[in-house]
Amino acid sequence: MVRRDRLRRMREWWVQVGLLAVPLLAAYLHIPPPQLSPALHSWKSSGKFFTYKGLRIFYQDSVGVVGSPEIVVLLHGFPTSSYDWYKIWEGLTLSFHRVIALDFLGFGFSDKPRPHHYSIFEQASIVEALLRHLGLQSRRINLLSHDYGDTVAQELLYRFKQNRSGRLTIKSLCLSNGGIFPETHRPLLLQKLLKDGGMLSPILTRLMNFFVFSRGLTPVFGPYTRPSESELWDMWAGIRNNDGNLVIDSLLQYINQRKKFRRRWVGALASVSIPIHFIYGPLDPVNPYPEFLELYRKTLPRSTVSILDDHISHYPQLEDPMGFLNAYMGFINSF
């Protein structure tokens, strides 16, 4: 009898917990995205949108040095947006006639359709479409990329090498801290869970919040160059815009695509004759030193490399903007 009473009370307790949890979970899942900070709002207001196959793509396009023919197109990383470039934006406008960046599909202020098969191939086609939209498809383009954007740049380079219809004419390429070699790439635990979680992945994306995001992202920055809480909120606001947290698992399939198309994309880097440079934050846990750098130099012996200070990690353009900009302009002025 005593045991039966205890079981009944336990069942009642769990029912009460469940009844309490349901509205709390419902409220949690409907938390609105954070308001944009003044800086992020200004970034959005100064940008524009164009339409690609019915989808709105956000981009920035600044006119810089008058009389210069040089154009630079910036390709951002995962899971953030074109806002990653804001610390070096003004510096680039002092050297280039046009400075252009976009939010890839599924990122930042661009549309984030779901369900959708996100792919590096589609993102490369969106970059090409943007340049056509701007009337720059026949101009020689300098590409500057980071992380996820490095792989988009590799696909653009492959199309350039193959002389594909509609491809960009690439003048130079500068990569930075991207996992271009699957064998030296070390994705974060949360990334592994989301990309290969199967039925669990959609649940994890819905449960993701600022706390989980910030604790996951902060370790890929150096110990002295970690973002402030307000900077992390800007990143999170970009992800939450248009419910972007719900497509993260789909976007992460790029890691599997890197493995599947390694020969195509690494081969493109190794076989073209244009100037290629790599800016490297050596404390990067995602592309660790020295394994990554040794393989890079072995695979691409003609490429030049800039290694930033020892404490700079995965986001060099945010952690050391002046060092990053100086390294990039040194490369541009070398040919």
Swiss-Prot record:
Residues annotated as transmembrane: 13-33, 88-108, 266-286
**Where is the motif (RVIALD)?**
98-103
Mind telling me which Gene3D superfamilies this protein's record contains? alpha/beta hydrolase (3.40.50.1820)
Keywords assigned: Endoplasmic reticulum, Hydrolase, Membrane, Transmembrane, Transmembrane helix
Q: Name one GO cellular component term.
A: endoplasmic reticulum
Q: In which tissues is it expressed?
A: No detectable transcripts during preimplantation development. Isoform 1 was not detected in either in vitro-matured oocytes (IVF) or parthenogenetically activated (PA) blastocyst. Isoform 2 was expressed in IVF and PA blastocysts.
- According to the UniProt entry, what is the EC number of this protein? 3.-.-.-
GO function terms (MF aspect): hydrolase activity
User: What name goes with this protein?
Assistant: Mesoderm-specific transcript homolog protein
Taxonomic lineage of the native organism: Eukaryota, Metazoa, Chordata, Craniata, Vertebrata
